[in-house]
């Protein structure tokens, strides 16, 4: 089939948007022959329906979107039913990036024993937090995990979870909370502390999911998209001022950032986490699988790697495209 002039991506969360906004607005997509349009699940958009978490797979399979960012559980479920269309093509980030903020009198993880920690209900959120606390030496049987509203519902949706979590700690509703970057910096600016937790490998944020029927019928489009994504990561890492300007304009107002320092901090942390070659790391795949799919008896007989197809990425890599981008850096 012909090359797509517009590629539509549905992002599972506003937290993916630092990269997607730069990808969309940097000119990289146009360089590779297409216009990129990005919608965000749960975020109202002018003259468009608000997409829900539950309809992501159906929207991808119907052709409404060419790619999804996220959708970490459904490909296993679909495959377990005999539907092999959903697959992951690339992974731009392989490490958990949540931050733990807390009351000003709490200075180390061990002090969280017996305390109330606000967290999200998704297995990849509360599950990673529990793992990180255990690695930090915390007896989590003594911790009360307060689950925020499910993603996209109520005042504790991911759209506003950073500022609302800071406010709840300051009101003494809870003692601590895990938040996205850069709300650890914002919390410190408002008198709270942030505790560093042990690193955890996990499939996270911008996982590129596709309908393989579409990919096989439109390989030129799929390869162009992946090459543009790879170049967008390079742009993000090497064009700091331009990337920060895009984030300040397109992302900061949506999530409640307060100042250029928070934009620059967010960019710096993301830049360090993004993979020049967006392959999934084995421990990251294993961790996500164990947190989520392994607990589902309807899908846990599917191997962790069955839903990954990185041969297009490997083809791009073997061509020397990625190495050439970074050769002079």
Name the predicted role of every residue range.
Residues 30, 34, 79, 134, ...:
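Short polybasic/polar patches that bind polyanions
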Residues 37-45, 261-273, 302-315:
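Short linear loop/turn motifs
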Residues 49-52, 80-82, 101, 188-191, ...:
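Short secondary-structure transition/capping segments
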Residues 292-329:
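Conserved C-terminal helix/tail region of periplasmic/extracytoplasmic solute-binding proteins
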């Amino acid at each position: 089939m012909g090359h797509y002039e517009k590629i539509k991506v549905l992002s599972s969360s506003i937290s993916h948007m630092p990269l997607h906004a730069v990808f969309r607005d940097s000119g990289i997509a146009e360089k590779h022959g297409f216009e990129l349009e990005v919608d965000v699940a749960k975020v109202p958009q002018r003259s468009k329906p608000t997409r829900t978490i539950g309809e992501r797979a159906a929207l991808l399979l119907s052709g409404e979107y060419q790619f999804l960012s996220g959708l970490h559980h459904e490909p296993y479920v679909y495959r377990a039913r005999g539907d092999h269309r959903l697959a992951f093509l690339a992974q731009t980030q392989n490490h958990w990036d949540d931050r733990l903020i807390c009351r000003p009198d709490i200075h180390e993880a061990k002090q969280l024993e017996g305390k109330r920690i606000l967290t999200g209900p998704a297995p990849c959120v509360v599950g990673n937090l529990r793992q990180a606390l255990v690695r930090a030496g915390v007896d989590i049987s003594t911790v009360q995990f307060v689950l925020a509203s499910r993603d996209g519902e109520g005042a504790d949706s991911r759209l506003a979870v950073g500022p609302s979590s800071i406010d709840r700690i300051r009101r003494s509703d809870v003692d601590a909370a895990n938040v996205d970057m850069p709300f650890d910096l914002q919390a410190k600016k408002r008198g709270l502390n942030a505790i560093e937790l042990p690193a955890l490998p996990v499939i996270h944020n911008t996982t590129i999911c596709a309908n393989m029927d579409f990919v096989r019928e439109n390989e030129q489009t799929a390869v162009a998209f992946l090459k543009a994504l790879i170049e967008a990561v390079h742009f993000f890492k090497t064009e700091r001022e331009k990337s920060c300007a895009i984030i300040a304009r397109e992302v900061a107002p949506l999530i409640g950032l307060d100042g250029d320092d928070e934009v620059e901090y967010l960019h710096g942390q993301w830049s360090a986490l993004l993979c020049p070659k967006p392959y999934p790391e084995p421990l990251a795949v294993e961790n996500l699988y164990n947190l989520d799919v392994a607990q589902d008896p309807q899908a846990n007989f599917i191997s962790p790697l069955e839903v990954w197809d990185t041969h297009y990425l490997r083809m791009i890599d073997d061509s020397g495209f990625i190495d050439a981008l970074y050769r002079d850096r």
